[in-house]
Curated annotation (Swiss-Prot):
Probable metalloprotease. Does not hydrolyze SAMP1- and SAMP2-protein conjugates, diglycine-AMC, Ub-AMC, hemoglobin, cytochrome c, carbonic anhydrase, creatinine phosphokinase, beta-amylase and bovine serum albumin. This is Probable metalloprotease HVO_1016. Zn(2+) binds at H87, H89, D100. The active site is at E31. The lineage of its organism: Archaea, Methanobacteriati, Methanobacteriota, Stenosarchaea group, Halobacteria. A motif (JAMM motif) lies at residues 87-100. Monomer and homodimer. The record marks S97 as: Transition state stabilizer.
Length: 161
């Protein structure tokens, strides 16, 4: 079973992008890094085929400085909704470095956010490091507190997908 799904990522929820921009600004002057989680577009009220980035997962044990951020792979969850990665460049450069490209092999979309972390200070890339379109979408996201409200039936249904 693959960690990253092969279906196309059609956009990012505005709330998820806002969270990442704020987190990047708060982490400055160090790099910020997270993983992107997606849901089927229609499940979040978007009338399109494919996935929408709905969440940014912060991985415990991530170490960062002004030039890099490193995620501990042993702490990355086996999340079947993972669609890519996101990180900041405190120097504002919105191009992937060689080290970035080495991490782009898994996932369909990778986002780099640059200082000063405004609404247009980011770029999306494909696995090869080529710029790609990624629409900012108004998605119907669930209340984050509801994440912890589930039953065994919910778990079984998720595993059967």
């Amino acid at each position: 079973m693959r960690l990253f799904r092969s279906r196309e990522v059609v956009g990012i929820a505005a709330d998820a992008l806002d969270f990442a921009l704020e987190a990047s600004a708060e982490t400055h002057p160090n790099e910020y890094m997270g993983l992107l989680r997606g849901e089927e577009a229609r499940r979040v009220g978007v009338d399109r085929d494919g996935y929408v980035v709905t969440d940014v997962l912060i991985i415990p044990g991530t170490v960062s400085d002004p030039y890099s951020a490193t995620v501990r792979n042993d702490l990355v969850p086996n999340d079947f909704h993972a669609v890519g990665s996101i990180h900041s460049h405190p120097n504002g450069v919105l191009r992937p470095s060689d080290a970035d490209l080495d991490t782009f092999g898994s996932g369909r979309v990778h986002i780099i956010i640059g200082s000063p972390y405004g609404p247009d200070d980011w770029e999306a890339f494909d696995q090869s490091g080529e710029v790609r379109d990624l629409d900012v979408l108004d998605a119907d996201l669930s209340d984050p507190e509801s994440f912890f409200d589930f039953t065994q039936d919910d778990i079984d249904a998720e595993l059967d997908r």
